[in-house]
């Protein structure tokens, strides 16, 4: 374990209007593992599932993917992510950090295309992979 890092897990959330990709770190914050993608029907259902994950996985922090354009401007979905962040802060007693997720979906698509050799991978798989990539990148940054 890296000196100075508290034992606990980090949950990554790749927010979407229909699906929410999730990944969680191991206790040493070294490896990201994908969790089942959540379907987004209503906020109450999502928050109850997230509360259960936070409890079961002993999550101490959430990193929330923040999609901004390549030029650095806030996108429409970026504004929705900011709203979702406020909702999470009101309902969970955890630090929630925004994480630039530019290109994670594109990287996910390329990985799946290479593995499956199909041009259109399922959206739920892309959401899950995006969360894994985002969290693994974050874990690499905090270990430096």
Model-flagged regions — what are they?
Residues 2-11, 18-144:
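Phosphate- and other anionic-substrate recognition elements at nucleic-acid/protein interfaces
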